[in-house]
From Swiss-Prot:
Protein name: Pyridoxine/pyridoxamine 5'-phosphate oxidase
Residues binding FMN: 47-52, 62-63, 68-69, 91, 126-127, 171, 181
Entry keyword annotation includes Flavoprotein: yes
Organism: Anaeromyxobacter dehalogenans (strain 2CP-C)
Binding note for cofactor: Binds 1 FMN per subunit.
Record NCBIfam families: pdxH, PRK05679.1
A GO MF label: pyridoxamine phosphate oxidase activity
Gene designation: pdxH
């Protein structure tokens, strides 16, 4: 299959264009992606995250660093992301190594979050067992009492991660399930691009 005309040399620019089209077509959580990780034994797990930036460095997301995903990444620092935009009939898959983002970037993003989200970040022991909802609500009240104003510092157990892409695949629906697939593979400082069978 010949390369489609949209096979631009820069997959990050192509992704950002697709994301803009997805946000225009269906603005609710266009940045949501399935994040797949695996623990030290290779046991996989997947969940949705919001990707907050995509640039030449990679794809950034933020989370509790004591969560299952963070424990997986500490043991096995590789991950895959999958963006699916039904309104466009397109998806993008990203695979690569994962590293923690600098604290300064985590601080800046944390400050931009709504107050209730910052409170929730302190109150939730993400992925830990929960006895009942009252336990969590009590933790929220305790955090609100501790930080009565708008200045709520970033918890030391909360931060960001960067997926540095080594492989990015763009998929677009085609008639008769003859879909269009273009893959970019990192080669040194550049990208090798090619088409895949549907």
């Amino acid at each position: 299959m010949p390369l489609p005309p949209s096979a631009a040399p820069d997959p990050i620019a192509r992704f950002r264009d697709a994301l803009a089209r997805a946000a225009a077509a269906s603005p609710h959580d266009a940045t949501a992606a399935a994040l797949a990780t695996a623990d030290a034994r290779g046991a996989p797990s997947v969940r949705m995250v919001l990707v907050k930036s995509a640039d030449a460095r990679g794809f950034a997301f933020f989370t509790n660093r004591e969560s299952r995903k963070a424990r997986d990444l500490a043991a096995n620092p590789r991950a895959a992301l999958c963006f699916h935009w039904p309104a466009l009939e397109e998806q993008v898959r990203v695979e690569g190594a994962v590293t923690p983002l600098p604290d300064a970037e985590a601080d800046a993003y944390f400050r931009s979050r709504p107050r209730e989200s910052r409170v929730g970040a302190w109150a939730s022991r993400q992925s830990a067992p929960l006895g009942d909802r009252a336990e969590l609500e009590a933790a929220v009240r305790e955090v609100e009492a501790r930080f009565p104003g708008d200045e709520i510092p970033r918890p030391p157990f909360w931060g960001g991660y960067l997926v540095a892409p080594e492989r990015i695949e763009f998929w677009r629906s085609g008639p008769g399930r003859l879909h269009h697939r273009t893959v970019y593979v990192r080669r040194g400082d550049g990208w090798e691009v090619g088409a895949l069978q549907p």
